[in-house]
Every structure is written in C-alpha cells, then in structure tokens.
Amino acid sequence: IKSQLLHTGEIERLSMERHGAIRLGTAAELSMMRRLFAVMGMHPVGYYDLAPAGVPVHSTAFRALDSHSLHKSPFRVFTSLLRLDLIADENLQQEATATLAQRQIFTTGVIELIEIFEAQGGLTAAQAEQFVQEALETFRWHDKTPVAKALYQRLLNQHPLVADVVGFKGPHINHLTPRTLDIDAVQQGMQARGIPSKAIIEGPPRRACPILLRQTSFKALQEAVGFKVANNSDASHEEYEQGHHTARFG
C-alpha cells in the first residue's frame, strides 16, 4: 500500500482526517448544513437509508467533487438525518419534535456569512476566518442538555441515536477517522495500551490484494453531562443534574 501511495503522490495525505460524522434532527437543519458545507466546497454525494439496519436515520456524505479538490482535502462528513416518523411511541415522537423545534444549531454570524458567500460567490480572507470560528460552534460538544434526565432516558430506550440527536443542543461530531497503512497494527496497538476497542476489525480479513475499506475504533466514551432539571421554579437560573452520555468514539 505504501508503494502505491508513493507512486500516486497520496502518501502525504495519509495523516489527514478522512471521515467524520454528524447527526441532524430536522430537514431545516439539513438544508442549512448543505449551505454551510457548500461554502467549503463540499457537496452531498450518495444516499443511504439505514432504517433496514435498525438505525432510524437516512444519510448522505458531504465532500469535494473534483479530483484536484479531493487531492488537497479528501475529508468527508457523513451526515445523518433523524427519522422522527420511526419513533413508535406517538407521545415521545411529539416531545422529540417539539424539543428539536426549539433549538438553533447555527449562530447568527455563520448564517450571515453563508448568505454573503451565496450573494458574492465567495468570502474574503477575513470573512473566511470568521466563518470557521462561527461554524465551529455548530459542531462543538455541549456538556449541558436541553432535556430532563427522564426524557433523555425515554429517548435512549427508543434508540441511543435518538437520544444523541434530540437530547443535545447541537450535532457534535461523533467520530473522526484517520487513515493508516496497517489497521491490524492499530487494532493491536489499542489493545496493548488498554484502550477499549471494537472486538474485531470491520470488513474483510487481511488479504494479499487491495481492499477498499477495513475499519476499527475505540469504543464510545462515557462522558459526564448535565441534564436540565424539569419544573425549575427559578426561570432566570437553569439547574442541571449530573448524568452520563455515551456516543462519541474514534
């Protein structure tokens, strides 16, 4: 593989992030996310319905389209939209819909810069720098949730992914995937260092021929979060109770 990458000039891209993933809650969020990614020259490619696999989302991947851009940055973001219609409990479906309707995952600043980009066909260097800072707010981790622990638990019981989308203020990046020349060595290295990893490498076994994709990761981390206290008497001061959430992995 190394010889092939040296021959094609791709070896320098080996250390680049190749793949990330986010999960969205509404069609409006997906529409604005499409516009946000377009600023960076990334466009939706492919359609994946994960419902037959028991995952209540359908997805696409945002990435560059032409070979020159892909050579400079092969990064793609697998973007999933929650299928609220697949929540069996009608009351829970309504609560989830209402919760998502109340959140805004994009800053005013990033929306303004997207509109400037669309109107003038690009951004200045200063605007581009500001755009990156504003966009980071959309993807960052929030350790305080907009839902009470009881609602979070009901969402979790429906499906962990439902809780991960509805239970948080934004679509935190749930994993990033680098590329390696030897994934077997990565798997063994994680296990040797006591890092909990997937039991097996996903994909075909090692073979004496090129393989499109084999992947592994460390297991999702249990992270401390604060759940919003329901029926808080002091509306001017939000209270939170401690809990945990498990979703982000790598």
Language model regions located:
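Extended, well-ordered protein cores
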Residues: 1-250
